[in-house]
Amino acid sequence: MTVQTFTPNQTTTLETAKKTIAEQSQNSQTTGNKIGFVSLGCPKNLVDSERILTQLRTEGYEIVNSYHDSDVVIVNTCGFIDSAVQESLDTIGEALKENGKVIVTGCLGAREDEIRQVHPNVLGITGPHAYQNVLEHVHQYAPKPAHNPFTSLVPDHGVKLTPKHYAYLKISEGCNHRCTFCIIPSMRGDLVSRPVGEIIGEAERLKNAGVKELLVISQDTSAYGVDTKHSLGFANGSPVRHNIKALSEELGKMGIWVRLHYVYPYPHVDEIIPLMAEGKVLPYLDIPFQHASPRVLKMMKRPGQAERTLERIKKWREICPELVIRSTFIVGFPGETEEDFQILLDWLKEAQLDRVGCFKYSPVEGAAANEIEDQIPEDVKQDRFERFMLVQQEISAAKLQKRIGSTMQVLIDEVDEEGAIGRTYADAPEIDGLVYLNGETNLKPGELVNVVIEHADEYDLWGSILHDAQ
């Protein structure tokens, strides 16, 4: 969808508990080394889950899909906003009820007392990206197998929870910013960039495994390398600077889709746009602007030059006319006046962004914004949210109408008896729009096909394959 509210994503190795328990045989046997796993929250958390699962699999643990068969269940939590915290606590509770042996990790794990107050019987709790600590807890309650039948079965690119044709590529951990609505730095720490050679190596393994799209993620993607003072690294024996432009250039050599997410609007982002115009990376930029009122941006501790940003967007589009810009915004931030909100709407109409997510401000325990006076009533937040959505829906619908009659390359995500569903370069998985190909049942996920766009609504496209141009 183009306009959205926040709902924590859930990726799990487990089937729905009630269905699974009902179907289990009373004679099921456990061997002491079977692990169930639930991953909540953002793609960055998903990558952490993949790393943990890869290590567990390498050590010989079996990953299973039912609470009943699991010797231990790991829940990788999200703690970004209150709804995410509640989702995490509910999931921990479900795992305790259905299995009883639960290890908790992730962002909410940084607030152990809060978890223990609700669920005192969890076996162990660790914070985010504490991979080794998670493994130590697993070793304590589900000892490593003496015989490892899976060593040769773990793929070079590790265990992935995404479909085979796309993968998230995390380039750094933590964040140096101190936005007043966010507590991520207190949970994940300051920016730590991965070595460029390590990133390129992982990307190559993913490509060799059949991945057609890399989604580059971090807390602050455009800050990549700041902590190393943009030192010189090496990838495949060649020198490469630790900065987002150089990294993007290297990734762009692989001949697959490269999509940049969570890009903070630093001045040097301007240097990436020519790479998009040249086709080295997808002309898609995910920049969380958050607001447009200078007063609100100052309270958020975000960049406050909204007019300057409009000028940059205009320049970007001149350099790369196909550029798609996705962003997220917060309405109902403490102290936001009707005048501030109107500035946001006017800016949105001027910016004509392609994909937009909207969140009603939600207090986060420990966030500095909670101390700001003039907290906004819930009914006012809802009203502003709906008005914001209407404006962006009109913008999105008009933009997609212009796609009708054009031919676009589409990456197929899924196929069923009704047809295929895919995405264009303008659409990231899970958060953006889709392309529906009715009746096209002979395609496979991961295929790239040329599609003539025939219909559009506010968010999605419909079309037919251009068979003689594939």
UniProtKB/Swiss-Prot annotation:
Cofactor: [4Fe-4S] cluster
Classification via Pfam families: Radical_SAM (PF04055), TRAM_2 (PF18693), UPF0004 (PF00919)
Subcellular location: Cytoplasm
Keywords, in A-Z order: 4Fe-4S, Cytoplasm, Iron, Iron-sulfur, Metal-binding, S-adenosyl-L-methionine, Transferase
EC top class named in words: transferase
Broad class of where this protein is predominantly found: cytoplasm
EC number(s) reported in the record: 2.8.4.4
Domain TRAM: 401-467
InterPro entries for the chain: Elp3/MiaA/NifB-like_rSAM, Methylthiotransferase, Methylthiotransferase_CS, Methylthiotransferase_N, Methylthiotransferase_N_sf, NA-bd_OB-fold, Ribosomal_uS12_MeSTrfase_RimO, rSAM
Family annotation (SUPFAM superfamilies): Radical SAM enzymes (SSF102114)
Domain MTTase N-terminal: 33-143
Binding site for [4Fe-4S] cluster 2: C175, C179, C182
Chain residues that bind [4Fe-4S] cluster 1: C42, C78, C107
UniProt catalytic activity: L-aspartate(89)-[ribosomal protein uS12]-hydrogen + (sulfur carrier)-SH + AH2 + 2 S-adenosyl-L-methionine = 3-methylsulfanyl-L-aspartate(89)-[ribosomal protein uS12]-hydrogen + (sulfur carrier)-H + 5'-deoxyadenosine + L-methionine + A + S-adenosyl-L-homocysteine + 2 H(+)
Xref: Gene3D superfamilies: Methylthiotransferase, N-terminal domain (3.40.50.12160), Nucleic acid-binding proteins (2.40.50.140), tm_1862 like domain (3.80.30.20)
Radical SAM core domain: residues covered: 161-398
Superkingdom to which the source organism belongs: Bacteria
Gene Ontology MF: a single term: protein methylthiotransferase activity
Record-level GO BP terms: tRNA modification
Gene Ontology cellular-component annotations: cytosol
Manner of cofactor binding, per the entry note: Binds 2 [4Fe-4S] clusters. One cluster is coordinated with 3 cysteines and an exchangeable S-adenosyl-L-methionine.
Cross-referenced PANTHER family: RIBOSOMAL PROTEIN S12 METHYLTHIOTRANSFERASE RIMO, RIBOSOMAL PROTEIN US12 METHYLTHIOTRANSFERASE RIMO
Protein role: Catalyzes the methylthiolation of an aspartic acid residue of ribosomal protein uS12.
Family stated for the protein in its record: Belongs to the methylthiotransferase family. RimO subfamily.
Record's protein name: Ribosomal protein uS12 methylthiotransferase RimO
Source organism: Vibrio cholerae serotype O1 (strain ATCC 39315 / El Tor Inaba N16961)
Organism ancestry: Bacteria, Pseudomonadati, Pseudomonadota, Gammaproteobacteria, Vibrionales
